[in-house]
Amino acid sequence: MAKIYATGKRKTAIAKVWLTPGSGKLTVNGTTLNDWLGGHEAIKMKVMQPLLLTKQEKSVDIVSVTLGGGYSAQAEALRHGISKALSAYDIAFRAILKPKGLLTRDSRVVERKKYGKRKARRSPQFSKR
C-alpha cells in the first residue's frame, strides 16, 4: 500500500502527516514523539488517541511535520491529521473516529482586536469624572 497523506489543523498550527503500513514508529519533525513532547504524557495520549481507538498503534508508521502555534495546538493538529489519514487508509475506521469528533476541524481561533478597545473585548477604563 502506498503512502497516505493528510493535513490536520488547530488554531494556527498545521500538521502534515504521511501514513504507511509498518511497525508503529511515530516521527514528528525528525524526532520521536517522546523527544518532541519532552515526556508530556497528557499530550502524548491526545496524539495517540486515534491510533488506540482503531488499534493501529503497532501496524502503521507515521511521519509528520508540524509548524505554527504552540505544542498543544500542534499536538491537536497532529491528532486531526492522523485521524484523517487513518480514515483514508481504511474506510471502516471512519465509523470509529467520527462519533468521537476526531475528524472534525476545531474552528475556534483567536478573536481579532477591534479599534477603540485594548484587546478583542476589553475596553479602556471608564472614568465618570
Swiss-Prot record:
<dbReference type="InterPro" id="IPR020568">
    <property type="entry name" value="Ribosomal_Su5_D2-typ_SF"/>
</dbReference>
<keyword id="KW-0689">Ribosomal protein</keyword>
<keyword id="KW-0687">Ribonucleoprotein</keyword>
<dbReference type="InterPro" id="IPR000754">
    <property type="entry name" value="Ribosomal_uS9"/>
</dbReference>
<dbReference type="InterPro" id="IPR020574">
    <property type="entry name" value="Ribosomal_uS9_CS"/>
</dbReference>
<dbReference type="GO" id="GO:0006412">
    <property type="term" value="P:translation"/>
</dbReference>
<dbReference type="GO" id="GO:0003735">
    <property type="term" value="F:structural constituent of ribosome"/>
</dbReference>
<protein>
    <recommendedName>
        <fullName>Small ribosomal subunit protein uS9</fullName>
    </recommendedName>
</protein>
<dbReference type="Pfam" id="PF00380">
    <property type="entry name" value="Ribosomal_S9"/>
</dbReference>
<dbReference type="GO" id="GO:0022627">
    <property type="term" value="C:cytosolic small ribosomal subunit"/>
</dbReference>
<dbReference type="InterPro" id="IPR014721">
    <property type="entry name" value="Ribsml_uS5_D2-typ_fold_subgr"/>
</dbReference>
<dbReference type="GO" id="GO:0003723">
    <property type="term" value="F:RNA binding"/>
</dbReference>
<dbReference type="InterPro" id="IPR023035">
    <property type="entry name" value="Ribosomal_uS9_bac/plastid"/>
</dbReference>
<comment type="similarity">
    <text>Belongs to the universal ribosomal protein uS9 family.</text>
</comment>
